[in-house]
Amino acid sequence: MAASESRRYVIVGNGFAGTTAAEHLRKHDPDCEIHLFGDEPYTLYNRISLPPMLRKQIPEAKVMIRDRAWHETNRIDLHLQTRVERIDTAARTAIAGGREYPYDALLIATGGRPNPAPAPGGTGAENVFNFQYLDETRAISERLESAKAAIAIGGSYIAYELAEAFASRKVEAHWVMRGPYALHRVLDDVAGEFVDAAAKADGVHMHYGAEVAEFVRSNGSVSHVRLKDGGTIAADCYGVGFGLTMNTEVLDGTEVEVSRNGILCNDRMETNVPGIFAAGDIADFYDPTLEMRYRMGTWNNAGAHGKVVALNMIGGSEPYHDVPEYSSLLFKGQTITQFGLSPELQPEIELVRKIDAGKGWYRSLFFWRDRLVGGIMLGKGNRAGKRKYVEAIKSKEPFPKPDREAMLDWTA
């Protein structure tokens, strides 16, 4: 590329990570050429607003973030409902719709797709849904208008958000999971009891150690699920939350290293192939603050990735230093907040916890190699101190065991 030519950037995936990267590429490289590809027919919308939309707490218009005019103003060539079929790393081109798009730097921000219903009969049924996209949210909401009962299946955050939404829509709500308590890969048993009490207080029927053996159909719809223990539960609407499969297929046949968690990249979000980057849910990246590799599917993490990766795509060397966070409603106006690592990501974590029955909240902090690396907060008004915890994580300061209990009372 001649010195006078503008740099060319291709971004595959127009979610929060990809669109944020495009925005910051334009900010830092005013004369560049940007092509942004997305599978859906929509410009960027706020995925963390889908649960409140499903609860009918906000209108759909509040979910949308960027329109076509914004892309035009920022001179971002937007290609919706357009799949990038493959990448030619030798020629440094992305191929989509029979056309080649040359790049000087390429970003893969394709995220993941929901795993299908985990038993026969669910896939393709008109009343069985995943909960990842705007169209799915519309379909579930429409189904709930006439539903009398709904079932959330899975022990994940997605299943929890479905169960919470079903309860808020005043249908008979069931939450079915294989685990011994909700969110068992993230929470301990004490926190699981807290969630159990909150769910039941909101009218949710909890089914632990329960696995769906079959979605039983009648005239195209599922009439009930049959459990492996022989029990049955009938409903009009079924929401499935069984994790994601990462969309790495665009890199098939390339030298880019991919793990079962996503695309391997360093602390600058660059892969083993120079000039190819990954960001958002799909990035299996090295975090220099927490000093380990992991994948984090949170909204704020995707945005932070987008900002950092843009700097590095234009030739910078900026490491990612943010701390991932997740926060959502937890039945009856309570909240669940998670920050940093969890035992699911680092099994060697040491935990300290506190329950305040009077205030109705639970709090746990996670330590690894004597450093604070994460935590969980449950209950009403139980987010005080979170910023201080995040700063402590970033500081890498060691905390001796005798000092850790007192940290549970941080409120500043």
Describe these PLM feature segments.
Residues 18, 159-160:
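N-terminal Rossmann-fold NAD(P) dinucleotide-binding loop
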Residues 2-8, 27, 282-383:
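Mid-to-C-terminal Rossmann-like scaffold of FAD/NAD(P)H-dependent oxidoreductases
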Residues 398-412:
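Cysteine/selenocysteine-centered motifs that mediate thiol-based redox chemistry or coordinate metal-sulfur cofactors
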Residues 2-10, 64-151, 226-229, 239-241, ...:
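FAD-binding core/adjacent interface of flavoenzyme oxidoreductases
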Residues 31-35, 78-95, 101, 169-265:
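A Rossmann-like FAD-binding core segment of flavoenzymes
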Residues 381-400:
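A short, polar/charged loop-to-alpha-helix boundary motif
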Residues 124-146, 218-226, 231-308:
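FAD-site-proximal beta/loop scaffold in flavoenzymes
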Residues 2-77, 165-186, 384:
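Beta1-alpha1 glycine-rich phosphate/pyrophosphate-binding loop at the start
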